[in-house]
Design a protein with these regions (language model features):
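GST-like domain detector, emphasizing the conserved glutathione-binding G-site
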Residues: 1-130
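GST-like fold's C-terminal all-alpha helical module
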Residues: 101-182
Length: 182
């Protein structure tokens, strides 16, 4: 295999990796999976590659499988041979890049998972509404934190990076999965 294979779904987290593959000029094939929350078939098809049946799932040119968007981001930067998308080790921007990459995927990203379908996590309708409101308030706090740390014109100041792909994508994920399905 000389190309990557990205398993994804339009509007889901795989779009982060799809955008990076495109930006870095890395060749790949895209395999769309069904809605993994609604399709047993989709989960079964993806499970041999990713036991959690989540996207993004990326098969590398050598056949190895990667999951977790932050890890994939770092791998793609290394594999591309470019140092303009992810600050390389030793670059003064590297520590802040890593901090905010992990912040986005560990803190902000999950708020979309919870807010898209709160009743997946809380069955009682009243409790689901309260949960959804709490997640929304927390997401706003997280985005204010990101905004306060952002440079200009890009997150790291004069340097465009993968963080800008994450932020640009994630700030446009509303109104949620139902909208993307249309």
């Amino acid at each position: 295999m000389t190309r990557y294979t990205l398993y994804g779904r339009p509007g889901w987290g795989s779009v982060l990796i799809e955008a990076q593959l495109d930006a870095l000029g890395l060749p790949y094939d895209y395999r769309e999976v069904p809605d993994l929350f609604k399709s047993d078939e989709g989960r079964r098809a993806l499970a041999p590659l990713n036991p959690l049946s989540q996207v993004p799932t990326l098969v590398l040119p050598d056949g190895a499988v990667m999951t977790e968007s932050a890890a994939i981001t770092l791998h793609l930067a290394d594999a591309s041979g470019r140092d303009d998308f992810v600050p390389p080790p030793g670059h003064p921007a590297r520590p802040q890049f890593l901090r905010w990459l992990v912040f986005l995927v560990a803190n902000v990203y999950p708020t979309f998972t919870y807010a898209d379908d709160p009743q997946r996590f809380v069955q009682d309708a009243g409790a689901a509404q309260a949960f959804d409101a709490a997640v929304g308030a927390y997401a706003e706090k997280l985005w204010r934190t990101v905004e306060a740390a952002a440079g200009a014109p890009w997150f790291l100041g004069e340097r465009f990076s993968a963080l800008d792909v994450y932020i640009g994508t994630m700030t446009n994920w509303s109104p949620g999965r139902a909208w993307f399905e249309q």
